[in-house]
Amino acid sequence: AEILFGDVRPPWMPPPIFPEMP
């Protein structure tokens, strides 16, 4: 998972779904 919106979970875990923000 890319480091977005504080997403620091392992790559084998599905990243949380965030709304499209500018």
From Swiss-Prot:
Instruction: State the species of origin.
Output: Litoria rothii (Roth's tree frog)
Report where it is expressed, by tissue.
Answer: Expressed by the skin dorsal glands.
Q: Which family does it belong to?
A: Belongs to the frog skin active peptide (FSAP) family. Rothein subfamily.
Q: What does this protein do?
A: Lacks antimicrobial activity. Does not inhibit the formation of NO by neuronal nitric oxide.
Entry's localization field = Secreted
Membrane spanning segments where?
A: none
* Name recorded for this polypeptide: Rothein 4.1
Q: Which GO terms describe its cellular component?
A: extracellular region
Keywords associated with the record? Amphibian defense peptide, Secreted
Superkingdom:
Eukaryota
GO BP annotations of the record are: defense response
Q: List the disulfide bonds.
A: none
Subcellular location, principal = secreted
